[in-house]
């Protein structure tokens, strides 16, 4: 029995209360992602980042205010913010992870009939999995990389945008 089975009622309550939204694992990056989605493997993102921050230790908040936060904590907060913004724009959320190839994509959406992979970077801005997915899948013309930085476009189809530009996707 998976954790999703054990906590099914609690997860459903959180979903009905609109406190979280789910990002389902997909086993393939082809359109239609819903055909490859697994209901038993997912990430749960809060719909209210301020609630998440209220649950955190004061020292974490101090690091955020002083802009000295690094590592997984910063990346997790950024990823949650991006996922929440996409959810509020009406996109069903998916993520991709392949244990064999070690490729992973933070968030995947479908826009205008095309799969769009999205990476969220807080520190190391390399996006090897995104680059590989784009190279191996001709039907995915571009992908987004959201960073705490500036705009950029690479020859391999990666569009780099500052975090706040998620509003324009």
Where are these regions (language model features)?
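Short, basic, helix/turn surface patches
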Residues: 49-54, 120-128
